[in-house]
Each structure stands twice: as structure tokens, then as C-alpha cells.
Swiss-Prot record:
Disruption phenotype annotation: Impairs growth on solid media under hypoxia and leads to triazole susceptibility. Impairs virulence in a murine model of invasive pulmonary aspergillosis (IPA).
Residues spanning the membrane: 257-277, 289-309
Stated family: Belongs to the dsc3 family.
Chain's gene name: dscC
Organism lineage: Eukaryota, Fungi, Dikarya, Ascomycota, Pezizomycotina
Gene Ontology CC annotations of this record: Dsc E3 ubiquitin ligase complex; endoplasmic reticulum; endoplasmic reticulum membrane
Gene Ontology BP term (one): proteolysis involved in protein catabolic process
Organism superkingdom: Eukaryota
Protein name, entry field: DSC E3 ubiquitin ligase complex subunit C
Subcellular location as annotated: Endoplasmic reticulum membrane
Keywords (A to Z) from UniProt: Endoplasmic reticulum, Glycoprotein, Membrane, Transmembrane, Transmembrane helix, Ubl conjugation pathway
Organism: Aspergillus fumigatus (strain ATCC MYA-4609 / CBS 101355 / FGSC A1100 / Af293) (Neosartorya fumigata)
Length: 309
């Protein structure tokens, strides 16, 4: 019997793993007589390989139809070896068994050899005609060795297609917008507006720069101002986002504190605040300085009302 190339014994396959060929008898649902098949390597031949072998024995008008193999009432999976699908016993039990009889004992004859029983595989021929691509995919998983080779080829191609690791650092902050189609002038204008917002709640000596500014921009872009209001745990070091939303929304507590304490200081200690601001420029943020000025105005208004009355 002639076997296709993918079912012929492979030179790299260890023949000791099986005790002999697997004897099968294929029984069809259509009016086609049964025929025997001998599978040399059932440990590496899959159900798809058996289908390929069966197609060589079918009439030309049925060789491309969809086949379904059934054994013991259960369908065989295409990618599973026959030794697993058919639940074959270990290889020594598939070899011919020598039975002793009286002639052997007397030395007057040879022991008869019990032939290995054949397994019946039911083959259902469907009405759907497979395309060339489907037949090629079926042939690609005819043996487990072909599957392993295909997996190795796919892994090798995937490694070749992967770009080499870049040595340049990824852009951070608003620089990420350059890859999204923004021009450098637009990114610079956006950064200027962002710095103007930060100057409302920060003094000049606490304005973020460098990596701190990039981290602040990343957080603003990724999480929004509500995440900035959550702040960064820790002591005096790190970045605080409590006052970075301009005093509105979830982070307005810092803005309210600035306005309240600034107004109280301007109302009860106007002269001291004026001297302090004169000697140390930039000691308060713009928001706190405005609150101090409002407190001073309220103090003057109360004083004028008291004098007039």
C-alpha cells in the first residue's frame, strides 16, 4: 500500500516508541466498501493525516468533501495524534503475541502468531466541498512533527518581524502630542498655558521643572485634574497635586484654604502682610496674594464705616 509523504516513516522519529503499525478499517456512511489502512506512526500521525490518507482512496468527486471521523461514538480532533484519540495501549501490547501450545512444548512445531485486531473508524462524508485553502490547512497538521515545525517557523518569523529595541527614551509630557500630529508651536503654547495655570497655586520657587514637570504633564493628560487632586503620598518631597486644578472641583480644598487664610491675614494683620510682601517678593502664590489683598480691603472698609458712624 502506498502512503503519502507525510505518513511515511520519518528518519528523525524514534521507531522504538511504537511496537508496530496501527491496523485500521475505515467504514463509510456512503455506499463505499470498507478498506483497510495501516498507519506506520500512530504516535505522530493526527486525525487530519488520516483524512488525507483516506482522500487518496476516495473517488475524485468525493475526495474534496468534508470528512468526519468517528471512533466509539466520539469524533476525532484533527490536531490530536491517533494514539491519543483512539486511546491506544502502550506499544508492546500492539505487537503480535506468541501463544504456546502443545506442539511448542513437544518441540514438534512453531507457536501460532495472533494477529493484531483491526480498529474500525467510521468516516462520514459531508456535502460541503472544501476549498484548496482548507485542504492545505488540513495537510499542514497531518503529523505532530509538521505542527512543531510550523510553530518553530512562526516563532522565528515573529522574532524577525519584531523591531529592535529602541535606545532613545520615549517622549514624556506634552511631547507625546508631537506623535499625534501636533506641531512644536502648538505643544509649546499648550505648555505655556499649563505653566500659567500652575503659577496660580505655586510660588516661583516651587514651580515644577524638568522631570517633575513632565510627570505633572503626563498625569494631567492621562488621569485629568481629578487624579491630580488626589496628590502623591509622602512628606515634603514629591509632587503635590492638591492645588493644581485652579480651585475648582474635587481639589478646591487647597484653593479655599488659600483664600480663607489670605483674607484672615489681610484683615487682622494688614501692615505686617504689606511689610512681609515688600521684603520677600514671591513668598505667596498669586491666589494667596489676591486673598490677602481682599482681606486688607475688607479691613479698610470696616475701618471707614466705623469712622463714618
Amino acid at each position: 500500500m502506498t502512503f503519502p509523504a507525510f505518513l511515511s516513516p520519518d528518519p528523525t522519529w524514534d521507531g522504538d516508541s511504537t511496537g508496530g503499525p496501527l491496523l485500521l478499517t475505515v467504514r463509510f456512511s456512503a455506499s463505499i466498501p470498507d478498506f483497510p489502512l495501516d498507519i506506520e506512526n500512530p504516535d505522530i500521525t493526527t486525525a487530519a493525516g488520516l483524512k488525507q490518507l483516506i482522500r487518496t482512496h476516495l473517488p475524485p468527486n468525493l475526495s474534496s468533501h468534508r470528512l468526519r471521523l468517528i471512533y466509539a461514538g466520539r469524533g476525532l480532533e484533527d490536531a490530536t495524534p491517533l494514539s491519543v484519540s483512539l486511546k491506544l495501549p502502550p506499544s508492546p501490547s500492539r505487537t503480535p503475541v506468541v501463544q504456546e501450545d502443545a506442539t511448542t512444548v513437544k518441540g514438534k512445531g512453531k507457536a501460532p502468531i495472533r494477529e493484531q485486531p483491526r480498529l474500525y473508524i467510521h468516516c462520514s462524508i459531508g456535502d460541503i466541498v472544501l476549498s484548496d485553502a482548507d485542504l492545505a490547512a488540513e495537510a499542514a497538521i497531518a503529523t505532530t512533527l509538521q505542527q512543531e515545525q510550523a510553530d518553530e517557523d512562526y516563532t522565528g518569523r515573529k522574532k524577525q518581524q519584531q523591531p529592535p529595541p529602541s535606545t532613545t527614551s520615549a517622549p514624556r509630557g506634552f511631547d507625546r502630542l508631537l506623535s499625534a500630529g501636533f506641531t512644536p508651536s502648538e505643544v509649546s503654547a499648550l505648555r505655556s498655558q499649563f505653566m500659567a495655570i500652575q503659577s496660580v497655586s505655586r510660588t516661583p520657587d516651587t514651580m515644577p521643572t524638568g522631570a517633575e514637570l513632565r510627570e505633572l504633564e503626563d498625569r494631567w493628560m492621562d488621569e485629568g485634574s481629578s487624579a491630580m487632586a488626589a496628590g502623591v503620598p509622602g512628606g515634603g518631597e514629591g509632587i503635590s497635586f492638591a492645588d493644581d486644578d485652579g480651585g475648582f472641583g474635587a481639589g478646591s480644598r487647597g484653593a479655599m484654604d488659600d483664600m480663607l487664610w489670605g483674607a484672615v491675614m489681610g484683615f487682622f494683620w494688614p501692615v505686617g502682610c504689606a511689610m512681609w510682601l515688600r521684603r520677600e517678593e514671591g513668598v505667596w502664590s498669586w491666589r494667596k496674594g489676591l486673598a490677602v489683598f481682599v482681606g486688607v480691603v475688607i479691613n479698610v472698609a470696616f475701618g471707614a464705616m466705623r469712622i463714618m458712624n
